[in-house]
Amino acid sequence: MKLGIILILSLLIRLIGLNQSLWLDEAISANVTKNYSIWEIPNNFSKSDFHPPLYYMMLDAWTNIAGDSEISLRMPSVIFSMVTIYVVYLMGGAGVAALVGFNPLLVYYSQEARMYSMVTMLLILGIYFWQKRKYFWVNLFFGLSFLTFYGSVFLPSGLSIYLLFKRKYGEIVKINIGLAAAILINMPLLKQQLVNSKMLLDQVTNWSLVLGKANLKNLGLIFIKFTSGRISFYPKYVYYLIAGLWAVFVWIKIIKINKWTIIFGLSLGVGIIFSIFTPMLQYFRFIYLIPIMALAMGGKKLVAGGFLVFSLIYVLNSNFYREDWKSLVENLGERVYMIESFGDPVKYYDEKIEVVDIRGKIEETKIAVIPYGAAIHGVNVEELLGGQGYKKSEEKNFREISLEYWEKEELL
């Protein structure tokens, strides 16, 4: 009965707002399924991407059957998250399942057409079968997790260090065969992607900030976002006070030392050390550790209730939803100027609109501009357009994004 209530409530929460606008990364996922066949994804698209191909291949197969609406694109992530809840129930009971089912960050990413919900499911399945000592399945799911998201490697690494401390050397080998095989299979692609990543870090001014440097701010955000999700509000000091106090309360609940606490800490520690050399310390890249956090905590009704409140605040308030590209595109004409590589949402919602890179030569007297992502590339839109004789005449704001209109000054 308890499990049924948890599953139903968890599903209902995830279905609210599932048709909200896609944001940039989700639009990339959608356009990959439109423009590449399932076999072209690893052979063509993935060479210019920074993720392994398995999620995109799964999504391509899914959309061929279910279509590519916002709801359809996100439904696999919903399903993966529901499987995660059930597996955690098998491992820790209804209380732990409630923590995972209601966790606001897991709710948010279970509504996203990206690979994070999928990799969370694969890793918790691997951990479940590790407990059962069924190593074939451990290797299968750990291997698949690497082919879904490279950052998944930190959990098997943390588990391996834990086993090393336990002097279970043979078991370390037993759980890493599949992961090693996946790394070898994917190595040619990974090498190419690493080269491309280094080039991007050199060419794009602030790209390392997107990836997530190893610093106290990004580390602190992991502990806050793991407990309160993606919601944020002004004034910021009030937000950080409320979210910070809640985070302290939750994390105190898992101070007790058990194997899950140790595995969580070791896995996160490996990720932090790795991020010193290759930036990737963003909280959403570690959400697969939230089920481990829940197992470390055990069933805590008050915490589960708090998680549910934060999740409801998110799903019932559209101000906390993703960037509203859908509404923005409805206001566009036949052409828009922006950083061209960030144009996937425009192409998803209206492929007839021409996306022109704002850094090129502009000859029109009146232009529509989306400044989104310009700062990452070190582009100051006002300086760039002002230097060409343009002046901003109008600005329309949508959720987290804006549309600007610029005209030659002599026409104003």
Regions found by a protein language model. Name each.
Residues S10-E407:
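Membrane-proximal helix-loop-helix interfaces that form the catalytic/acceptor-binding platform
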Residues L411-L412:
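Short, solvent-exposed mixed-charge patches
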